[in-house]
């Protein structure tokens, strides 16, 4: 196989998708997320944390103190890709279910609460009136 064929085969190979968490082993705080590529997500988060560029400032702070040894990267639920189905919507639904418990916000975790639809619409409207 040449390089071009290998690249095409890689892109066409279905990736495992699902919900994951990054758990602080010291204080049990968690970051919960979902992804279409479970294989790559942990590498992405490790890279961001090692480069001190993770979007969660609290997680970054704790990572800087404890390092990789202080955290566990765990798959909470895996979802099989299905044709004729909005896989991203399924993932978002699953993530929302996992966010209900343990509600990893504030003292319990590193996630930021999702805004309600009304809050998002209000923000969009406010930006339009400012511009």
Task: Give a label for each model feature.
Residues 1-32, 36-127:
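Structure-specific nucleic-acid interaction/processing domains
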